[in-house]
A protein has these predicted regions:
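Short catalytic micro-motifs in class I SAM-dependent methyltransferases
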Residues: 101-105
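S-adenosyl-L-methionine-dependent methyltransferase catalytic module, highlighting the catalytic core
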Residues: 110-111, 115, 119-121, 125-228
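Glycine/Thr-rich phosphate-binding loops of Rossmann-like dinucleotide-binding domains
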Residues: 51-53, 107, 136
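GHKL-family ATP-binding catalytic core of two-component histidine kinases
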Residues: 88-90, 107, 147
């Protein structure tokens, strides 16, 4: 995707401005890690390349994945190959769990959420980040998009209580991201011309995002849920 190339030359403040979803995701994982007791067991379900490991250096971090999502990724940091619908762990052994932009890639999301609930200890918490309006990615393993209501339903059915559920941006941040998406259709000499047309409005639009009060047009959601004691 175009973002991998863009991130290499963007200064930090501009990365946060243009690629807001990515920045919010990183903040959410870092902040979540800060709430977990030192030494506690943490499951990263659908960890991919385990790039969030840096935030859990003081925990017993267990990244698992089925390793079929992207054939360009390096899965060597994964501790176990695991089908998220049947996690290879006893019940109630993790203090916390992550499921970061992974739930759209599973055919049985309810079973996955229920498995996360099963392996959490009473009082344990799970951080989920899910897409709402997003392009197809990691095809053909891309099955679902989620509304706030659908996510609440999945969590409720698994016996989890929602503590936090927040949209990541509104209409104008969504449109900014979509303009950047458009750069991928241009090559050679047409690319700088397209960049001149698409990047300036992409820079301006996020400043208008406060106009969207409901945030029904959003890139995705960050959610924290707890297993009852």
């Amino acid at each position: 995707m175009i973002y991998a190339h863009v991130q290499r030359w963007l200064p930090g403040w501009l990365h946060r401005h243009l690629l807001h979803f990515d920045a919010v995701l990183e903040d959410a994982v870092r902040d979540f890690a800060g709430t977990i007791p030192v030494g506690a067991r943490v499951l990263d379900a659908g960890a991919g390349e385990a790039r969030h490991a840096q935030y859990f250096a003081r925990h017993q971090y267990t990244p698992v994945d089925l390793a079929i999502g992207d054939d360009t990724w390096d899965y060597t940091r994964i501790q176990a190959l695991a089908d998220l619908t049947a996690l290879p762990f006893r019940s109630g052994v993790f203090a916390a769990a992550l499921n970061i932009v992974t739930l759209e890639h599973v055919r049985e999301p309810q079973q996955v959420v229920s498995e996360l609930a099963r392996v959490l200890e009473p009082g344990g918490r799970v951080l989920l980040v899910v897409p709402h309006e997003w392009e197809v990615h990691q095809a053909p393993h891309d099955y679902f998009r989620y509304t706030r209501y659908g996510l609440r339903h999945l969590l409720s059915q698994a016996g989890l209580e929602v503590e936090q559920l927040a949209p990541v941006g509104g209409y104008f941040r969504l449109m900014s991201r979509r303009l950047l998406n458009g750069l991928q259709f241009f090559r050679g000499l047409s690319f700088p011309i397209a960049a001149l047309l698409l990047v300036p409005p992409a820079l301006v639009l996020p400043w208008l995002d406060g106009l969207d009060k409901e945030k029904n047009f959003t890139l995705g959601y960050v959610c924290v849920a707890r297993k009852p004691q």
